[in-house]
Structure formats: C-alpha cells, structure tokens
C-alpha cells in the first residue's frame, strides 16, 4: 500500500457516525488519530485527506469550502507530508467552464470542475499549503445515455451529457490536471 485516503466525503452527514461534532474540527480529531497510526506503521506512505463532496450547506451537508476552512482552523496546516483529496465534480459543465449561468445545474461554483480546483488551491494557499499536492480521488461526468426512462427531477442535468461528452471531458480534465503544479494522481 503506497497511499491511504482518510475517509470519504466527511462533509456529508450520511458519512458521519458517532459523537464527534459534524464539522471540520471533528474530522481533524479523526484525521489526527489516523495520521499518527499510519505514521507509526510507515514514515513514507502518502496520507490523503478525505475528499470533500462539492456541496453547499443543507440539512445533510456542510459546504465543502467551509468544511476545508474549518479543517485548517483545527490544524490541517500543521501537516506538511500529506496530500489533499478533492472531488471536483462538474455536473453538466465542461471541465474548463466556470460559474455561473441560469439553468439550475450551472448556477453554483460547486458545479464546476475548474472552480472547484481554483477554490481549493486558493484556500490551501491562504493557509500556507500552496505546495501541497491535490489528489483528485473522485471526478467524472454522469450521463443518462443508454438508460430507459428519465432520471429523477434533481438529476435532469444528466440528459445534457452524452457518452461523447463524458469521454472527452474526462480526457480534458486529465489534461488540465497535468498542466497544474502540485496536482497528484487523478482517479
């Protein structure tokens, strides 16, 4: 094992169980313990901070940018030998597109690959982590091509992405990542 990601989308309440507060500081309590255990086993294994779900504040989630800032306020900046896991999903928007439009799936910076990359890097830079690598541990474009019927109402944007968009945008996202300094692996 060369790398371990500590958790997945900890800013979603459905991923959270227990009594530790549901916020970035609560995640850092768990990350601190995991980091110490991993480092006791291996001084060189890559430790990846759990990738956040790109979302705003809802009953089931904390805005990913807010959650990341909470993590920094709780000590994330003290770690120099880690990578930041990110999930820069882009709904029905091309990877180089930036916010905002009026269609409902393009009216929020959370819905844009490019905005997600830029905003995460900015928050990292503000907290002295400009050199830290970002690992894209989830990304991609969903399509409804080949499925019968219609997607649920909140997933109608999938009708705007065909299989060719999905393939081409994935390739372009890899190209964007390869051009960025401090970009780690992209899954």
Q: Each PLM stretch: what is its role?
A:
Residues 165-173:
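Substrate-gating cap/lid alpha-helix
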Residues 45-46, 181-187:
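A non-catalytic structural micro-motif
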């Amino acid at each position: 094992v060369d790398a371990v990601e500590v958790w997945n989308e900890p800013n979603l309440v459905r991923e959270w169980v227990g009594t530790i507060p549901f916020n970035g500081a609560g995640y850092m309590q768990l990350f601190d313990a995991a980091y110490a255990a991993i480092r006791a086993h291996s001084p060189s294994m890559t430790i990846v901070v759990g990738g956040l779900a790109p979302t705003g504040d809802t009953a089931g989630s904390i805005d990913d940018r807010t959650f990341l800032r909470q993590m920094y306020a709780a000590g994330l900046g003290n770690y120099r030998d880690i990578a930041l896991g990110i999930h820069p999903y882009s709904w029905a928007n091309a990877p180089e597109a930036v916010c905002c439009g009026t269609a409902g799936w393009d009216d929020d910076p959370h819905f844009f690959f490019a905005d997600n990359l830029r905003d995460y890097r900015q928050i990292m830079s503000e907290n002295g982590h400009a050199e830290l690598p970002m690992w894209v541990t989830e990304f991609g474009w969903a399509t409804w091509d080949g499925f019968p019927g219609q997607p649920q109402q909140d997933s109608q944007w999938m009708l705007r992405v065909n299989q060719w968009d999905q393939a081409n945008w994935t390739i372009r996202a890899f190209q964007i990542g390869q051009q960025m300094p401090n970009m780690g692996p992209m899954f």
